[in-house]
């Protein structure tokens, strides 16, 4: 009688299929949208004397972009704030991740408000329309759409083109004489500068996707390197963001002074206003109106994509922390589509709550900077003080200097914007309380030991048990739940004296904001549904004399994983059941059986049991 075999987890790695063009488009969907509202907020902060502030913010943005090229080169598996700060301290990493959570909450609300404004919704109805938009995003994400940034990718080129057209139409009307110097003291100018720091928002996105970027030609999966890919993705986007913001700001400030009230009223959709005005002046009034509508649609959809990105990233950060033991494990529970339930609810409810508690767009923008600046500062500070990173003295100096500037900005925000300070403290307080509760439940404590003792504690323990398989055919069965297809597979394996590989793929459709520190390989014993299936099959296999090999995988694409495992394990026959998904789920996620049939190698027979 064959002995039942308890299989080890099958590790599934995300493919590195994001080239520099796709990475640049994804980055532009986050970073490139900042100009849609930054220049309007600059005018509200300093009026016609805001050009020096815009120049200073763009200069800082360029320096931060250079810093993130360095970060991406040293963190090819994910260089977000959580991954970078974790090398210094788990507590610091959690604090940085919570600041990122605060950033994503306000990003969803602010980008949604700007999106509906660009699409023509009035200021009076913008709050309600934004809440509805966020709810729609939540409903879509309940079914777990992949985080591909498809809208950003398709709209990146049109967005760049309309920016170039606005600058071209305004070129003949740019005036140096209309630019006013700063009228206030350094302290007042610094506070105004801090209020326009939102141009940095989105740059963190590139560090979070290094784990799926294509490797450089001179690297390998064992020694990954994405310096070239990251550089080619960051540089063009940084150039467009910096020069686009400067030129659009110059175009805004070149308008006559009597346009001041109109500029203040259009702070949420400044690019649409500039497109209407300069398009009408350059060609004809009807063209200006049409061009303004086109700009509104392009940037409205791009900002809608930014809302979706923020929601998905917020879910991913909370899920990653829960998987890593920094949040209660209940936050990692998934719905039937592989999406974390409680993080999804929080990602929808919290931005709507912030919308309800803020008075207007300016108040919302005031909450924004505290999260994004704090997260970037923690990331740069952790890297600049990390002696294990092979940084040159110039790189470390630039990174440390940028950290000091951002730290000063964060302190200024805390001093001058009490609402932002209260918001950040609330997110940090609630998050760290949940972290303490999670550690208490799991029995984790913090100990201080010598380096010699710490070096002896390594996660790579020797493997003491290896599966023993019978020679002969291999049959693989993939099923969701206990159903007749499992009995059919057992009968086939018993008849053919074959090894039966029982595959359970746990779908986790979550965008990981960074690369978490995995605490051991995934085990089917820890998943209730997989445990029920595998235990039953091991018992039945032992009674029938069938060698059963459990195979457990965690993946965002069940069909691709099943096909990959079938080919890798060299099975002769794959048995699957008919799809149990509804029509709406098939529309959003696709049919698993169809995907398997289209991609399975011809040498493997496919049996669909219905």
Predicted regions and their residues:
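Membrane-interface "cap" regions at the ends of multi-pass membrane proteins
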Residues: 1-38, 83-85, 91-94, 189-193
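Hydrophobic alpha-helical segments and their helix-loop junctions in multi-pass secondary transporters
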Residues: 124, 157-182, 249-257, 379-392, ...
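C-terminal membrane-solvent junction of multi-pass transporters and transport-like membrane proteins
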Residues: 151, 330-341, 376-418
């Amino acid at each position: 009688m064959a002995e039942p075999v308890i299989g080890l987890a099958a590790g599934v790695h995300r493919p590195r299929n994001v080239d520099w063009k796709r990475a640049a488009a994804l980055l532009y969907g986050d970073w490139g949208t900042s100009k849609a509202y930054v220049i309007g907020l600059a005018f509200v902060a300093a009026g016609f004397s805001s050009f020096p502030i815009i120049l200073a913010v763009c200069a800082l943005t360029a320096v931060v972009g250079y810093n993130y090229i360095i970060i991406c080169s040293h963190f090819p598996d994910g260089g977000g704030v959580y991954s970078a700060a974790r090398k210094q301290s788990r507590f610091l990493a959690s604090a940085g991740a919570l600041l990122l959570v605060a950033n994503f909450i306000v990003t969803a609300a602010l980008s949604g408000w700007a999106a509906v404004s660009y699409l023509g919704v009035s200021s009076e109805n913008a709050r309600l329309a934004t809440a509805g938009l966020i709810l729609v995003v939540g409903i879509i994400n309940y079914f777990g759409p992949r985080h591909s940034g498809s809208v950003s990718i398709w709209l990146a080129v049109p967005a760049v083109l309309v920016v170039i057209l606005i600058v071209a139409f305004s070129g003949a009307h740019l005036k140096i004489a209309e630019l006013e110097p700063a009228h206030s003291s350094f302290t007042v100018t610094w506070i105004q500068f801090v209020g326009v720091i939102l141009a940095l928002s989105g740059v963190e996105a590139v560090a979070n996707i290094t784990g799926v970027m294509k490797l450089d030609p001179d690297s390998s999966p064992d020694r990954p390197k994405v310096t070239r890919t990251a550089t080619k993705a960051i540089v063009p986007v940084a150039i467009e963001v910096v020069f686009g913001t400067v030129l659009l700001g110059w175009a805004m400030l070149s308008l006559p002074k009597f346009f001041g009230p109109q500029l203040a009223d259009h702070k949420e959709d400044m690019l649409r206003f500039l497109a209407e005005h300069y398009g009408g002046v350059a060609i004809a009034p009807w063209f200006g109106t049409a061009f303004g509508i086109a700009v509104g649609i392009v940037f409205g959809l791009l900002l809608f994509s930014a809302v979706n990105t923020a929601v998905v990233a917020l879910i991913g950060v909370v899920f990653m922390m829960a998987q890593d033991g920094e949040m209660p494990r209940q936050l990692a529970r998934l719905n039937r589509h592989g999406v974390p339930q409680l993080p999804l609810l929080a990602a929808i409810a919290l931005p709507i709550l912030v919308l309800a508690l803020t008075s207007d767009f300016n108040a919302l923008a005031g909450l924004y900077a505290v999260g994004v600046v704090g997260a970037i500062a923690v990331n740069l500070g952790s890297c600049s003080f990390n002696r294990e990173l092979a940084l040159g003295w110039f790189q470390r100096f630039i990174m440390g200097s940028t950290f000091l500037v951002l730290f000063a900005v964060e302190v200024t925000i805390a001093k001058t914007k009490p609402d932002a300070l209260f918001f950040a403290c609330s997110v940090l307080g609630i998050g760290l309380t949940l972290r303490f509760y999670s550690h208490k439940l799991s029995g984790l404590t913090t100990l201080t030991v010598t380096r010699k003792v710490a070096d002896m504690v390594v996660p790579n323990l020797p493997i003491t048990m290896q599966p023993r398989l019978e020679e002969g055919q291999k049959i693989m069965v993939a099923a969701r739940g206990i159903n007749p297809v499992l009995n059919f597979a057992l009968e086939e394996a018993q008849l053919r004296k074959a090894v039966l590989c029982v595959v359970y793929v746990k779908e986790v459709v979550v965008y990981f904001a960074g690369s978490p520190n995995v605490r051991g390989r995934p085990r089917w014993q820890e998943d209730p549904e997989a445990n029920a299936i595998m235990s039953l099959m091991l018992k039945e296999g032992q009674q029938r004399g069938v060698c059963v090999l459990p195979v457990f995988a965690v993946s965002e694409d069940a069909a691709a994983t099943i096909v990959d495992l079938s080919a890798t394990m060299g099975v002769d026959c794959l048995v699957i059941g008919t799809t149990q998904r509804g029509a709406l789920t098939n529309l959003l996620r696709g049919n698993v059986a169809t995907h398997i049939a289209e991609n399975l190698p011809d040498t493997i027979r496919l049996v669909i049991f219905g």
